[in-house]
């Protein structure tokens, strides 16, 4: 369960950070 959550977070966080900081 945990590794899957980490994998999802690793995929989602860069996208969220990109959207917030407008640095893509």
Swiss-Prot record:
Role according to the record: Has antibacterial activity against E.coli and S.aureus strains. Has antifungal activity against C.albicans. Has hemolytic activity against rabbit erythrocytes.
Keyword Secreted among UniProt keywords: yes
InterPro entries with a match to the protein in the record: Antimicrobial_frog_1
UniProt keyword annotations, A-Z: Amphibian defense peptide, Antibiotic, Antimicrobial, Cytolysis, Disulfide bond, Fungicide, Hemolysis, Secreted
Disulfide bonds: 18-24
Principal place of residence: secreted
Family: Belongs to the frog skin active peptide (FSAP) family. Brevinin subfamily.
Protein name, per record: Brevinin-1JDa
GO process annotations (BP): defense response to bacterium; defense response to fungus; killing of cells of another organism
Subcellular location as annotated: Secreted
Taxonomic placement: Eukaryota, Metazoa, Chordata, Craniata, Vertebrata
GO cellular component, one term: extracellular region
Tissues expressing this chain: Expressed by the skin glands.
């Amino acid at each position: 369960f945990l590794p899957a959550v980490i994998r999802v977070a690793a995929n989602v966080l860069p996208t969220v950070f990109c959207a917030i900081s407008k640095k893509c």
